[in-house]
């Protein structure tokens, strides 16, 4: 009976797993394989195509538009990651302290994460286009009197603001979870040794929440490198392609620009870049944890 029961359980687990694996293969693995195959062709998204070997990959390194999108995306990812984690950590420290209504504040700060990125993007689009310039005119400020989204020098800052605003919520929750794992005994021992303020955070709190910091850093960099919805809602890559992210370029030129094969090669390279960066982040933060 025992063996039959175990075999029955295994069969049940197998029957549950097979549909999930099949769906994952059909909607994730298979498109990935087809994308890699198309990256070696001149496929336009329709009609016939010819094999071109590594030409698409070679052209990526000489295409100025691709280079510009990589520069913008990395600049956005670096700045947005720093802004998001600094603000999130400050908020987490405040919300983890003994204050009134902290549960209400935690819920309020999490609302941006519930909203869809496109919805948030369109709301901020209206804010940057109409509301902020109106305030700028009232205050007599020329820089604020015109929409940030119409300036090649300021549009990327608007994208950073929107990306950070929506990402801060989840990061704050993760940091709060990390802070709650720090034993009170550590702070009591630190207080005896005279640790207060910045020294308390630097030498006691931060080393103990390094794993949570690592998670936030990896998630932030990955999400910001793949930014798409905010670009679509705010600028559509403009003005003058100054806010064209890699994901938006792949979508725009691949789907409607007749560069399906070329942008498939771009997507493959981009995938490799994200994997390499994520592995490097985990390796560096892992070594940091061991040192601490």
Residue ranges and their predicted role:
Residues 3-292:
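A structural signal for multi-pass alpha-helical bundles of membrane permease subunits
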């Amino acid at each position: 009976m025992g063996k039959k029961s175990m075999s029955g359980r295994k069969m049940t687990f197998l029957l549950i797993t097979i549909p999930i694996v099949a769906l994952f293969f059909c909607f994730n693995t298979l498109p990935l394989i087809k994308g890699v195959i198309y990256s070696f062709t001149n496929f336009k998204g329709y009609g016939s195509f010819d094999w071109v070997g590594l030409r698409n990959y070679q052209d990526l390194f000489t295409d100025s538009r691709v280079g510009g999108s990589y520069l913008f995306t990395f600049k956005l990812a670096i700045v947005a990651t720093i802004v998001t984690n600094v603000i999130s950590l400050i908020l987490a420290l405040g919300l983890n302290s003994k204050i009134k209504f902290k549960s209400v504040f935690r819920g309020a700060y999490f609302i941006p994460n519930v909203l869809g990125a496109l919805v948030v993007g369109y709301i901020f689009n209206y804010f940057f286009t109409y509301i902020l310039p109106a305030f700028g005119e009232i205050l007599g400020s020329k820089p604020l009197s015109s929409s940030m989204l119409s300036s090649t020098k300021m549009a990327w800052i608007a994208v950073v603001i929107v990306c950070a605003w929506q990402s801060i919520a989840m990061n704050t929750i993760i940091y709060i979870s990390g802070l709650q794992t720090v034993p009170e005994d550590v702070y009591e021992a630190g207080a005896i040794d005279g640790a207060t303020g910045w020294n308390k955070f630097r030498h006691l709190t931060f080393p103990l929440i390094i794993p949570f910091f690592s998670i936030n850093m990896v998630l932030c960099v990955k999400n910001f490198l793949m930014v798409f919805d905010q670009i679509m809602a705010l600028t559509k890559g403009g003005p003058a392609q100054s806010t064209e992210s890699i994901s938006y370029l792949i979508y725009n030129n691949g789907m409607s620009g007749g560069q399906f094969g070329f942008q498939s090669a771009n997507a493959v390279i981009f995938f490799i870049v994200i994997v390499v960066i994520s592995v490097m982040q985990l390796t560096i933060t892992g070594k940091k944890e061991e040192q601490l």
